Amino acid sequence: MPSPRIRKMSLSRALDKYLKTVSVHKKGHQQEFYRSNVIKRYPIALRNMDEITTVDIATYRDVRLAEINPRTGKPITGNTVRLELALLSSLFNIARVEWGTCRTNPVELVRKPKVSSGRDRRLTSSEERRLSRYFREKNLMLYVIFHLALETAMRQGEILALRWEHIDLRHGVAHLPETKNGHSRDVPLSRRARNFLQMMPVNLHGNVFDYTASGFKNAWRIATQRLRIEDLHFHDLRHEAISRFFELGSLNVMEIAAISGHRSMNMLKRYTHLRAWQLVSKLDARRRQTQKVAAWFVPYPAHITTINEENGQKAHRIEIGDFDNLHVTATTKEEAVHRASEVLLRTLAIAAQKGERVPSPGALPVNDPDYIMICPLNPGSTPL
């Protein structure tokens, strides 16, 4: 029996058809749309599907891996190319069986770029403060989304898809009926997470946030560019949140997986070094409780300036930059240091009482007389 006749269709047309009939029903439709547009920029897109060989696919792979991402100035990652090849492979399988535009899948036999070990980008205290301040001043919705990501480890798509009818603020649970891995999930909401959500107009039903995926992506890009924060993806906040869960030392791996939605424990192995670091304090059983408490109350760098008050007299202003709006003013430098120490002590004590995270002390600029260390426990020892 003769083989069915091949229908001629260019790869570009096939990608369009795939997007309209197959990809549109997937959760990752938007991402496949972007990848399809990338592929269509290359000569391979003009070839008919039945004419494309493994050599053509390998050439496309190598060309992409040799290119520089104009947005980041870095080489295109292997993960990016691997996902583009996965799209092509899915397309060829559909076309071979259902459309009759090719007889083989040339992508299957081509070597794929290795899967990277994953990004390990941590959000610094300075970046967190700057982004928080920027979003609070510019857009309340972005402010809530940013902090909700850090409190819950939810993915961008999960946050943007939140609906009020799925949020129980009384019991502190957000229900995600559909997630990336195809399973529903209940996300525990900390007190801080609930407080952030309540900044939004609370309704009985409907979307919590109005952003589309592309709109939010653009807003995030603009914010990081204006603040000159390099190489920080929104998805890095999920990594940051999970890292903080491990650093708490009070949650086991299974509990963290239940919060984050990881179906495979292998995905959480990259965080085990954080767990080991936390176990040091538990192994040191002889450490006194006072030492644990004192660990909260460490010195912080502060900037001291001389200002002119309205009455014409000079005053001294001290600002502790690791905290938002933590500053004092006094007529003498000694009094300013004493007040700054008291305010810092009160701030740290309240955070310790509530179990809230505080920023780590930043670096003290070398040989800069305008910077001093403020000690919350012993203001008299603070160098002037």
From Swiss-Prot:
Residue ranges annotated for the Core-binding (CB) domain, each copy included: 9-96
CDD domains for the chain: INT_Rci_Hp1_C (cd00796)
GO annotation (BP), single: DNA recombination
Protein family according to the UniProt entry: Belongs to the 'phage' integrase family.
Domain named Tyr recombinase: residues: 118-284
Keyword ATP-binding: no
Entry annotated with the keyword DNA-binding: yes
Descriptive protein name: Shufflon-specific DNA recombinase
Protein task: Shufflon-specific DNA recombinase.
Pfam families listed in its UniProt record: Phage_integrase
PANTHER family tied to this protein: INTEGRASE_RECOMBINASE HI_1414-RELATED, PHAGE INTEGRASE-RELATED
